[in-house]
Design a protein with these regions (language model features):
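Generic N-terminal amphipathic/basic segments
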Residues: 1-62
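Short amphipathic alpha-helix that is part of the acyltransferase structural core
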Residues: 1-28, 130-164
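Acyl-donor-binding surface of acyltransferase catalytic domains
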Residues: 58-62, 70-136
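Conserved acetyl-CoA-binding loop-helix of GNAT-fold acetyltransferases
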Residues: 73-86, 211, 217-234
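Conserved hydrophobic beta-strand within the GNAT/NAT acetyltransferase core sheet
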Residues: 97-99, 207-209, 239-242
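A conserved beta-strand-loop-helix scaffold within acyl/acetyltransferase catalytic domains
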Residues: 31-32, 57-61, 168-179, 183-212
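Active-site rim helix/loop that mediates acceptor-substrate recognition in acyltransferases
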Residues: 21-42, 159-180, 184
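Short hydrophobic/aromatic beta-strand element in the GNAT-like acyltransferase core
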Residues: 40-44, 54, 121, 177-181, ...
Protein backbone atom coordinates (compact mmCIF):
# COMPACT_ATOMS: atom_id res chain seq x y z
CA UNK A 1 0.00 0.00 0.00
CA UNK A 2 1.42 3.35 -1.06
CA UNK A 3 0.46 6.57 0.70
CA UNK A 4 1.01 10.10 -0.60
CA UNK A 5 1.63 12.85 1.94
CA UNK A 6 2.68 16.47 1.68
CA UNK A 7 6.26 17.06 2.83
CA UNK A 8 6.69 19.83 5.40
CA UNK A 9 10.48 19.64 5.79
CA UNK A 10 12.61 19.36 2.67
CA UNK A 11 15.43 17.90 4.75
CA UNK A 12 13.40 14.67 4.83
CA UNK A 13 14.14 14.31 1.11
CA UNK A 14 17.91 14.77 1.33
CA UNK A 15 18.85 11.19 0.40
CA UNK A 16 16.23 10.95 -2.33
CA UNK A 17 17.33 14.26 -3.84
CA UNK A 18 20.92 12.99 -3.93
CA UNK A 19 19.75 9.86 -5.75
CA UNK A 20 17.65 11.97 -8.12
CA UNK A 21 20.62 14.07 -9.23
CA UNK A 22 22.87 11.01 -9.40
CA UNK A 23 20.48 9.48 -11.94
CA UNK A 24 20.67 12.50 -14.27
CA UNK A 25 22.79 12.11 -17.39
CA UNK A 26 23.96 15.75 -17.38
CA UNK A 27 23.87 18.70 -14.96
CA UNK A 28 20.36 20.03 -14.43
CA UNK A 29 19.27 23.66 -14.71
CA UNK A 30 20.10 25.36 -11.42
CA UNK A 31 17.40 28.01 -11.78
CA UNK A 32 14.71 25.35 -11.96
CA UNK A 33 16.01 22.90 -9.40
CA UNK A 34 17.44 25.28 -6.81
CA UNK A 35 15.31 28.34 -7.49
CA UNK A 36 11.79 27.24 -8.41
CA UNK A 37 11.70 23.74 -6.88
CA UNK A 38 12.34 24.76 -3.23
CA UNK A 39 9.39 27.19 -3.32
CA UNK A 40 7.05 24.53 -4.75
CA UNK A 41 5.00 21.84 -2.99
CA UNK A 42 6.71 18.50 -2.30
CA UNK A 43 4.79 15.26 -1.87
CA UNK A 44 6.30 12.06 -0.48
CA UNK A 45 5.49 8.49 -1.48
CA UNK A 46 5.40 6.12 1.50
CA UNK A 47 5.27 2.32 1.71
CA UNK A 48 4.66 0.95 5.22
CA UNK A 49 5.71 4.30 6.61
CA UNK A 50 8.99 4.38 4.67
CA UNK A 51 9.70 7.25 2.27
CA UNK A 52 10.40 5.69 -1.15
CA UNK A 53 9.91 8.60 -3.54
CA UNK A 54 8.54 12.08 -4.08
CA UNK A 55 7.28 14.57 -6.62
CA UNK A 56 7.28 18.36 -6.84
CA UNK A 57 4.36 20.46 -8.07
CA UNK A 58 4.62 24.22 -8.60
CA UNK A 59 1.90 26.76 -7.85
CA UNK A 60 0.61 26.63 -11.42
CA UNK A 61 -0.01 22.88 -11.31
CA UNK A 62 3.07 21.64 -13.20
CA UNK A 63 5.31 18.79 -12.08
CA UNK A 64 8.97 19.78 -11.72
CA UNK A 65 10.47 16.56 -10.33
CA UNK A 66 9.31 12.95 -10.01
CA UNK A 67 11.27 10.12 -8.40
CA UNK A 68 10.65 6.61 -7.09
CA UNK A 69 13.41 4.39 -5.72
CA UNK A 70 14.20 1.11 -7.45
CA UNK A 71 13.42 -0.75 -4.21
CA UNK A 72 9.83 0.51 -4.05
CA UNK A 73 7.09 -2.05 -4.60
CA UNK A 74 4.82 0.37 -6.44
CA UNK A 75 4.83 0.44 -10.24
CA UNK A 76 6.28 3.79 -11.22
CA UNK A 77 4.28 4.07 -14.45
CA UNK A 78 0.99 3.37 -12.66
CA UNK A 79 1.83 5.87 -9.92
CA UNK A 80 2.75 8.58 -12.42
CA UNK A 81 -0.45 8.00 -14.40
CA UNK A 82 -2.55 8.15 -11.24
CA UNK A 83 -1.06 11.52 -10.36
CA UNK A 84 -1.21 13.19 -13.77
CA UNK A 85 -4.79 11.99 -14.29
CA UNK A 86 -5.68 13.92 -11.13
CA UNK A 87 -6.61 10.84 -9.11
CA UNK A 88 -4.64 11.89 -6.03
CA UNK A 89 -6.73 13.96 -3.65
CA UNK A 90 -3.56 14.94 -1.78
CA UNK A 91 -1.70 16.34 -4.80
CA UNK A 92 -4.71 17.73 -6.63
CA UNK A 93 -4.83 19.00 -10.21
CA UNK A 94 -1.81 18.47 -12.45
CA UNK A 95 -1.83 20.47 -15.69
CA UNK A 96 1.49 19.32 -17.15
CA UNK A 97 5.18 18.92 -16.43
CA UNK A 98 8.58 20.47 -16.98
CA UNK A 99 11.27 17.86 -17.60
CA UNK A 100 14.83 17.75 -18.93
CA UNK A 101 16.20 15.29 -21.46
CA UNK A 102 18.88 14.65 -18.81
CA UNK A 103 16.20 13.08 -16.58
CA UNK A 104 15.64 9.82 -18.52
CA UNK A 105 13.14 8.08 -16.23
CA UNK A 106 11.01 11.15 -15.59
CA UNK A 107 11.20 12.11 -19.28
CA UNK A 108 10.09 8.64 -20.37
CA UNK A 109 7.07 8.79 -18.07
CA UNK A 110 6.12 12.21 -19.43
CA UNK A 111 6.45 11.15 -23.08
CA UNK A 112 4.32 8.06 -22.44
CA UNK A 113 1.51 10.26 -21.14
CA UNK A 114 1.67 13.42 -23.24
CA UNK A 115 -0.42 14.70 -26.12
CA UNK A 116 2.04 17.44 -27.05
CA UNK A 117 5.24 19.09 -25.89
CA UNK A 118 7.40 22.11 -26.66
CA UNK A 119 10.97 23.11 -25.92
CA UNK A 120 11.23 25.57 -23.03
CA UNK A 121 15.01 26.06 -22.93
CA UNK A 122 18.28 24.68 -24.29
CA UNK A 123 21.05 23.65 -21.91
CA UNK A 124 24.70 24.31 -22.72
CA UNK A 125 27.79 22.90 -21.03
CA UNK A 126 31.41 23.97 -21.35
CA UNK A 127 33.51 21.60 -23.45
CA UNK A 128 36.38 19.97 -21.53
CA UNK A 129 38.57 20.68 -24.56
CA UNK A 130 37.50 24.31 -24.92
CA UNK A 131 40.32 26.42 -26.28
CA UNK A 132 41.22 30.05 -25.68
CA UNK A 133 39.43 32.54 -27.91
CA UNK A 134 39.94 36.11 -29.02
CA UNK A 135 36.80 37.54 -27.44
CA UNK A 136 37.33 41.07 -26.17
CA UNK A 137 37.54 41.17 -22.39
CA UNK A 138 35.00 43.09 -20.36
CA UNK A 139 35.42 44.68 -16.94
CA UNK A 140 32.54 43.66 -14.70
CA UNK A 141 32.23 44.54 -11.02
CA UNK A 142 30.67 42.61 -8.16
CA UNK A 143 27.24 43.99 -7.30
CA UNK A 144 26.73 45.54 -3.87
CA UNK A 145 23.73 45.73 -1.57
CA UNK A 146 23.50 49.48 -2.23
CA UNK A 147 22.95 48.76 -5.94
CA UNK A 148 20.14 46.24 -5.36
CA UNK A 149 17.21 48.55 -6.17
CA UNK A 150 18.82 49.73 -9.41
CA UNK A 151 19.64 46.16 -10.43
CA UNK A 152 16.06 45.06 -9.75
CA UNK A 153 14.70 47.93 -11.87
CA UNK A 154 17.09 47.01 -14.68
CA UNK A 155 16.20 43.32 -14.72
CA UNK A 156 12.47 43.95 -14.39
CA UNK A 157 12.56 46.33 -17.34
CA UNK A 158 14.76 44.06 -19.46
CA UNK A 159 12.98 40.71 -18.98
CA UNK A 160 9.71 41.55 -17.23
CA UNK A 161 10.40 39.52 -14.08
CA UNK A 162 8.44 40.45 -10.92
CA UNK A 163 10.31 42.98 -8.78
CA UNK A 164 9.43 41.22 -5.52
CA UNK A 165 10.97 37.97 -6.74
CA UNK A 166 14.00 39.75 -8.20
CA UNK A 167 14.67 41.55 -4.92
CA UNK A 168 14.99 38.29 -3.04
CA UNK A 169 16.83 36.53 -5.85
CA UNK A 170 19.38 39.28 -6.49
CA UNK A 171 19.76 39.97 -2.78
CA UNK A 172 20.82 36.38 -2.25
CA UNK A 173 23.26 36.47 -5.18
CA UNK A 174 24.83 39.68 -3.87
CA UNK A 175 25.29 38.15 -0.42
CA UNK A 176 27.00 35.15 -2.04
CA UNK A 177 29.13 37.37 -4.33
CA UNK A 178 27.66 35.73 -7.42
CA UNK A 179 26.24 38.76 -9.25
CA UNK A 180 28.19 41.20 -11.45
CA UNK A 181 27.24 44.34 -13.31
CA UNK A 182 28.56 46.13 -16.37
CA UNK A 183 28.12 49.87 -16.03
CA UNK A 184 28.62 52.92 -18.25
CA UNK A 185 28.02 56.43 -16.90
CA UNK A 186 26.14 55.06 -13.87
CA UNK A 187 23.80 53.07 -16.12
CA UNK A 188 23.60 49.27 -16.09
CA UNK A 189 24.06 47.74 -19.52
CA UNK A 190 24.30 44.10 -18.44
CA UNK A 191 24.32 41.77 -15.45
CA UNK A 192 26.04 38.43 -15.09
CA UNK A 193 25.52 35.56 -12.65
CA UNK A 194 27.94 32.78 -11.74
CA UNK A 195 25.98 30.62 -9.33
CA UNK A 196 27.66 27.89 -7.31
CA UNK A 197 25.84 24.86 -5.93
CA UNK A 198 25.82 24.18 -2.19
CA UNK A 199 24.88 20.54 -2.72
CA UNK A 200 24.56 18.32 -5.77
CA UNK A 201 26.39 19.29 -8.98
CA UNK A 202 29.03 21.11 -6.92
CA UNK A 203 31.60 20.73 -9.71
CA UNK A 204 29.57 23.10 -11.90
CA UNK A 205 28.82 26.82 -12.03
CA UNK A 206 25.47 27.90 -13.45
CA UNK A 207 25.78 31.06 -15.55
CA UNK A 208 23.14 33.64 -16.32
CA UNK A 209 23.06 37.12 -17.85
CA UNK A 210 20.78 39.94 -18.90
CA UNK A 211 21.62 42.60 -21.48
CA UNK A 212 19.73 45.87 -21.84
CA UNK A 213 17.39 45.77 -24.82
CA UNK A 214 19.09 48.74 -26.49
CA UNK A 215 22.49 47.01 -26.28
CA UNK A 216 21.52 43.66 -27.78
CA UNK A 217 23.00 42.47 -31.05
CA UNK A 218 26.32 44.22 -30.42
CA UNK A 219 28.31 41.32 -29.00
CA UNK A 220 27.97 42.39 -25.37
CA UNK A 221 26.37 39.11 -24.30
CA UNK A 222 29.30 37.17 -25.76
CA UNK A 223 31.75 39.23 -23.72
CA UNK A 224 29.71 38.81 -20.52
CA UNK A 225 29.45 35.05 -21.02
CA UNK A 226 33.20 34.87 -21.67
CA UNK A 227 33.88 36.77 -18.44
CA UNK A 228 31.65 34.43 -16.44
CA UNK A 229 33.18 31.33 -18.01
CA UNK A 230 36.68 32.53 -17.18
CA UNK A 231 35.61 33.25 -13.60
CA UNK A 232 34.13 29.75 -13.21
CA UNK A 233 37.21 28.12 -14.71
CA UNK A 234 39.49 30.07 -12.36
CA UNK A 235 37.69 28.40 -9.46
CA UNK A 236 38.03 24.93 -10.91
CA UNK A 237 34.37 24.76 -11.96
CA UNK A 238 32.79 23.71 -15.24
CA UNK A 239 30.44 26.31 -16.70
CA UNK A 240 26.89 25.57 -17.79
CA UNK A 241 23.92 27.73 -18.77
CA UNK A 242 20.48 27.67 -20.35
Amino acid sequence: MLDIKKISSLSDLSELKTAYFADSTAPLDGMWHFGFVPMSDHFGFYENGKLVGYCVLNGEGYLLQFFLTATANANIADLFTLIIENNSSVIGEVKGAFVSTAEPQYLSLCLDNTESFKVNALMFRQRPTAIANNIENIEMTLATEEQLDQLVEFASSAIGAPKEWLTGYYGNLIARQELWGYWESDSILATGECRKFDEHQTQFADLGMIVAQAERGKGLATRVLNFLTQHATSQGLEAMCS
